[in-house]
UniProtKB/Swiss-Prot annotation:
<comment type="similarity">
    <text>Belongs to the pseudomonas-type ThrB family.</text>
</comment>
<dbReference type="GO" id="GO:0009088">
    <property type="term" value="P:threonine biosynthetic process"/>
</dbReference>
<dbReference type="InterPro" id="IPR005280">
    <property type="entry name" value="Homoserine_kinase_II"/>
</dbReference>
<keyword id="KW-0547">Nucleotide-binding</keyword>
<keyword id="KW-0067">ATP-binding</keyword>
<dbReference type="GO" id="GO:0005524">
    <property type="term" value="F:ATP binding"/>
</dbReference>
<dbReference type="InterPro" id="IPR002575">
    <property type="entry name" value="Aminoglycoside_PTrfase"/>
</dbReference>
<keyword id="KW-0791">Threonine biosynthesis</keyword>
<dbReference type="InterPro" id="IPR050249">
    <property type="entry name" value="Pseudomonas-type_ThrB"/>
</dbReference>
<comment type="pathway">
    <text>Amino-acid biosynthesis; L-threonine biosynthesis; L-threonine from L-aspartate: step 4/5.</text>
</comment>
<dbReference type="Pfam" id="PF01636">
    <property type="entry name" value="APH"/>
</dbReference>
<protein>
    <recommendedName>
        <fullName>Homoserine kinase</fullName>
        <ecNumber>2.7.1.39</ecNumber>
    </recommendedName>
</protein>
<dbReference type="GO" id="GO:0004413">
    <property type="term" value="F:homoserine kinase activity"/>
</dbReference>
<dbReference type="InterPro" id="IPR011009">
    <property type="entry name" value="Kinase-like_dom_sf"/>
</dbReference>
<keyword id="KW-0028">Amino-acid biosynthesis</keyword>
<keyword id="KW-0418">Kinase</keyword>
<keyword id="KW-0808">Transferase</keyword>
Length: 332
């Protein structure tokens, strides 16, 4: 969520004429992230986020915005796109598609504990089930075909050892994706980027027995139809790791995965390929971070992520992956 496209006061005034959101009180760019131009927008009607989509096209965008509306209608806390005066959920700003969505309450928890992971696991499973009847179908655009297309451009910048890992894991994942077991994995709309900074928490209401309350999931602009287990793996690889080493925190991982299973139990195929999918989740972000680090775009406020973080996670997942935890039922 860096700012690649600047928006002046006059640009904003012209844009806001298409919305019934009152008068603008504050407007500022959001410096984190690397994909779209994002701005916090405060008006006399409330708080919002304006996003200018730097890569997504007008043809692709309805999948994401309609998905957010669909999930919200099914009780999943996500930003709600605001219709324009013509009823459309997005328009054009500086020749690029742009939209306004509601701003969720709460703050990111960058040092999550077990209780945070329980909340995330349960809500991720609810998101997956809520998306089962979503009518649009668009693949995860950062999956195997994207890796195969972009790895050759990265290779000249990295060491021989990194190249061996990058190309070897690509071959491993290509084989996994071609397998019958992979085809049998449950699938549907996925967030595909559910990192700690894409989830908000607020204080729980008194008397609920909980210290935290999940405020919502946001930044759905990497979402796509994929295997649900991939979404779980991406989430675990961020929420349940030691950030210095990439080693899984067993207590947090166990809490998140057990909580997920209380809503949607894992299948036998998912249990069999948990290690492969954790590796796929790590590989996806190692490739994209290498690409953004060595082949960056110009931006006003760009903070590229360290590619080494997901290299460490990938190496660790290849070496050590615990099995998915079982959940106890009345029949056990």
């Amino acid at each position: 969520m860096a700012v690649f496209t600047a928006v002046s006061d006059s640009d904003l005034a012209q844009w806001m004429r298409h919305y019934e959101l009152g008068d603008v009180l504050a407007f500022r760019g959001i410096p984190s992230g690397i994909e779209n131009s994002n701005f916090f927008l405060t008006t006399t009607r409330g708080e919002y986020v304006l996003t200018i989509f730097e890569k997504l096209t007008a043809q692709q965008l309805p999948f994401y915005l309609d998905l957010m509306r669909h999930l919200a209608a099914h009780g999943v806390p996500v930003p709600d796109p605001i219709p324009r005066d013509d009823g459309a959920l997005f328009g054009e700003l500086h020749g690029k598609p742009a939209a306004i969505v509601t701003k969720l309450d709460g703050a990111a928890e960058l040092a999550p504990g077990v209780e945070h992971c329980i909340e995330v696991g349960q809500m991720l499973a609810r998101l997956h089930l809520a998306g089962r009847d979503y009518p649009r179908n668009q693949p995860n655009l950062r999956s195997l075909p994207w890796w195969q297309e972009n790895v050759p451009a990265i290779v000249p910048f990295i060491t021989d050892a990194q190249r061996a890992l990058l190309e070897g894991e690509l071959a491993h994942q290509a084989g996994f994706f071609a397998s019958d077991d992979y085809a049998a994995l449950p699938a549907g709309p996925c967030h595909c980027d559910l990192f700690r900074d894409n989830v908000l928490f607020a204080h729980a209401a008194p008397g609920t027995g909980h210290d935290v309350r999940l405020g919502g999931f946001f930044d759905f602009y990497f979402a796509g139809c994929d295997k649900w287990l991939f979404d779980v793996a991406v989430t675990v690889n961020d929420w349940c790791v030691d950030l210095a080493t990439g080693v899984l925190d067993v207590a947090r991982a166990d809490a998140l995965l057990r909580a997920y299973q209380t809503v949607r139990p894992f299948t036998a195929e998912e249990r069999r390929h948990w290690s492969d999918m954790l590796r796929a989740g790590a590989y996806r972000f190692w490739v994209s971070r290498l690409y953004d680090f060595y082949l960056p775009r110009a931006a006003e406020m760009l903070k590229p992520h360290d590619p080494g973080h997901f290299e460490r996670i990938l190496r660790e997942r290849i070496a050590h992956t615990p099995a998915l935890p079982e959940i106890q039922t009345a029949c056990n």
